[in-house]
Structure formats: structure tokens, C-alpha cells
């Protein structure tokens, strides 16, 4: 599901920063709002420009898209953590999700909170092959 074995930085927090990203990818794989809620801060926004207008969801709206029914083609889907940049209590990450003919490129801002690293915001683009 992810490239968890490949270190992208020498930062001592890398493993901890990966936790919410891997929860996010697992949430997609299992179609699980529970995993998404564990990955994101409750105040997170998820945004993209799709076919012109801005799409902007709060976490509750985003989680309504998940109903614990993995996609029929789940076995063929790929998800990778491509880049990580970590400085102090802030980080950014790029994740690629290949879901059939659609490739999603996700950019995340993460923060180290009292509950550990969490995704603060996500901006994404969907490209149809």
C-alpha cells in the first residue's frame, strides 16, 4: 500500500510523521472514516480545484464519503509517500494515489500536536489518464 520501508529523510521524527499519512492511505484502502478521523486534526480542511470551482470540505463532510466498503479494484490501487519535509513541529508531505484511471496528487501540511503528528490540511489534484 505504501513505501513505508523507504526512508525519505534522516529526521528522527520521520516514523512519527508517517503515522497519520499511513492512516490516511489505510482509510482509502478500507474506505474508513475512522482512519481518516485518526489521521486529521478535527479542524482540517481538504481542498482542490475540480473542473473550475474550488472544492473545500471540512473533516466531517469529507468523512461522509467513506462507508467501510473497499473499492472492487482495491487490489490494483497504489499509494505512495513521495516526499517529506520536517522542521520542528511542522511537516509537509506529497502522496500519490493511483485509483484506476485517476491519479491523485495530495499535498499535506502536518503539525505535531499533544496527540502526536496530525494532518492539518490537504490540497489535492485529480488527473484522469
Model-derived features: positions:
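Residue-level signal for alpha-helical context at structural boundaries
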Residues: 10, 35, 39-42, 53-55, ...
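Short beta-strand segments enriched in hydrophobic/aromatic residues
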Residues: 40, 97-99, 123-124
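Surface-exposed, charged secondary-structure patches
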Residues: 12-16, 45-103
Amino acid at each position: 500500500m505504501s513505501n513505508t520501508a523507504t526512508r525519505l529523510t534522516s529526521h528522527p521524527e520521520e516514523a512519527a510523521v508517517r503515522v497519520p499519512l499511513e492512516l490516511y492511505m489505510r482509510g482509502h484502502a478500507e474506505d474508513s472514516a475512522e482512519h481518516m478521523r485518526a489521521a486529521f486534526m478535527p479542524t482540517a480542511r481538504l481542498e482542490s480545484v475540480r473542473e473550475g470551482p474550488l472544492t473545500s470540505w471540512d473533516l466531517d463532510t469529507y468523512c461522509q464519503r467513506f462507508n467501510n466498503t473497499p473499492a472492487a479494484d482495491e487490489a490494483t490501487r497504489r499509494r505512495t509517500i513521495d516526499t517529506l519535509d520536517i522542521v520542528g513541529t511542522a511537516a509537509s508531505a506529497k502522496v500519490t494515489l493511483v485509483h484506476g484511471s485517476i491519479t491523485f496528487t495530495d499535498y499535506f501540511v502536518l503539525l505535531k500536536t499533544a496527540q502526536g503528528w496530525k494532518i492539518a490540511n490537504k490540497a489535492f489534484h485529480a488527473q484522469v489518464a
